[in-house]
């Protein structure tokens, strides 16, 4: 997300592909996970954009504490009860996300959200190598030190998140 509160190109493309998948599958809830610290509300921006793209607000669930890929996926299972999922993210990041989901015992398939070249991709690739190393061990241990909210039913109303 940009400093002015608008979605970055990567974030925009993730939401755009998510809206396309939603339209193709129909009545499937979307779980948007990201950072919501203080005034930085990544998940709020994602939901607003998804709704603008035609996804009903009640079908968009927010995980406000998805500070890392591992945390997002752990919380998807522990808080939201996800057992099967479609992970939508950029290609460079997709393999790690799928590995984590599978290590946590979830069935997962991935859809690439690469709709254009991205500025700073070399930096993202370098960061991804470090994150793979870190998350490999975290996923193998299957532990989480963060806060877990009460369970949320993905068959409920996403507006309550």
Regions of interest found by a model, annotated:
Residues 1-126:
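A structural signal for short, hydrophobic/glycine-enriched beta-strand patches
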Residues 37-41, 109, 131-138, 154-159:
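A general structural signal for short secondary-structure boundary/capping elements
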Residues 125-147:
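A transmembrane-helix-recognition feature enriched in membrane-embedded lipid enzymes
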Residues 143-161:
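Short linear elements at protein peripheries
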